[in-house]
Regions:
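PAS and PAS-like sensory/regulatory domains
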Residues: 65-69
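Short regulatory alpha-helical coupling segments
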Residues: 6-14, 32
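Alpha-helical scaffold within the catalytic cores of cyclic-nucleotide enzymes
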Residues: 6-7, 38-59, 90
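Catalytic-core segments of nucleotide cyclases and related cyclic-nucleotide turnover enzymes
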Residues: 32, 40-43, 75-108
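A short pre-motif secondary-structure segment
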Residues: 19-21
């Protein structure tokens, strides 16, 4: 699953973006100079693209389920430290997970 997510994240990234694995099952995509609405749209496109993939047993083809992701989106501010930026993205991710999973949530205003 991690390989599928990482590959799809890289495929959907622009040349100026930086996709990365961040922690055990978490990924990050730094989108240079992207408007917030574009970042939100890209996150939802990624979520939809991954949901079209099914986990299958390689031996018998049995379907285990879809790949789902929860995404938190934050915008870097000029006054941000890396820690404050990541904290806002993590808070949005936590909200996505606790509000039903398989969704994209923007940072709190």
């Amino acid at each position: 699953v991690l390989k599928v997510v990482g590959t799809k994240l890289k495929q959907m990234s622009r040349d100026v973006d930086t996709p990365a694995r961040y922690g055990g099952e978490e990924f990050a995509l730094l989108m240079l100079n992207a408007p917030f609405d574009v970042a939100m749209r890209r996150a939802d496109q990624l979520r939809e693209a991954l949901a079209s993939n099914y986990l299958r047993n390689v031996t018998n083809g049995e379907i285990y389920g879809q790949i789902t992701v929860s995404v938190g989106v934050a915008k870097h501010r000029a006054t941000d430290s890396i820690e404050s930026f990541i904290a806002r993205a993590d808070a949005a991710l936590y909200e996505a997970k606790t509000s039903g999973r398989n969704r994209v949530v923007a940072e709190a205003a």
